[in-house]
Amino acid sequence: MVQKEVLELKRRFKKDRATFPRVCGVYVDANKQKQAAMNKQFLNLDEEVMHKYLEIANKTLSGKVGDALLNVNVHGGSEDQEDMTKLLMGVKDSHLEDDGLLNAFYDRVIETYDSAEPYYIILFYDAYDVMTKTSDNEKLDESEIVYEYILCSICPVKLSKPGLGYLEAENKVGLRIRDWVVQTPAVGFLYPAFNERSTDINAALFYSKNTKEPDHTFMESFFRCTAEMTKTEKKERFTSVLRNSLAESSNDAVTYAFHEKLNELAEERMEQDKEEEPLTAEDVKEIAEEAGIDEEKAEQIAKAYTSSFGNDKPTAGAVVDSKLLGQQLIKENAELKAKIVDLMAENAKLKERLNE
């Protein structure tokens, strides 16, 4: 899925637009036991409760595709994957009304999701009449397909912070009762994917709140797939490769020059509509040499890059250190302003001498 398709779905997650026929969930305690199952028609929820569930649904599709949101291939041909796909399709096709399938789904989550804390599994079901669009993105009246999907959110449940509060029954201020509060989702997923604005049963969209250390274990165990790195992980790994390869032989100027050249490549590919083209080892070597790094060291960086990323290579734009470039730009602007101030002061002194 691309960002535009995610936003198209999220636009529906508002009170006046939400059409979820049903929502269900179960609380899982610290001993991995199911408690307090819930299954209701979404529009029958109290207004405040509905608002909170919509917040969770929105959060489960938040962030950028390739970072917080990862496309997952769920069709690998293995028996485990076929069983998992069959279960997900069954849950979707039942419109969340088959308790046996729901319990099987919950059990699979509990089996594959590693958490020492209690959590709340939520499932939304929706059917979206996908409007046909013309080449200039104008909507037509007719709906060609109905996109049916489930959205799963796994939310940690934590004790509220201790503190003082007004105890109305006793008419005094004292220690308030600590409640177990449902947090924003740590992970979640959309199935089937909404690829090219249509149903793709061979793919899912996985959400991870933590992009630095996403829950790859759950993703791989649940979907029986190989997890890809987030853009944040790729960027940090690339930074580590560059730092370790340069070691003591580098300085800030060399690192800046490298990222400046890398950024030029990213912008060039964007202009050519090739921004998704992977950064090759040859690209890395060429950039290093253009940044003033000697050929031998550039070759070492390229080899370390290949060893670290294998076939899951990032794009140039994904690993550019924009923060470093921004800081350097601020520094250069400050230096330029200081020079201008000095020149203005010298100019003022010259005028004074001429007027004497």
Residue spans of the language-model regions?
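Long, hydrophobic alpha/beta structural blocks
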Residues: D29-K351
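Acidic, metal-dependent phosphodiester-chemistry machinery of nucleic-acid enzymes
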Residues: V2-L7, Q41
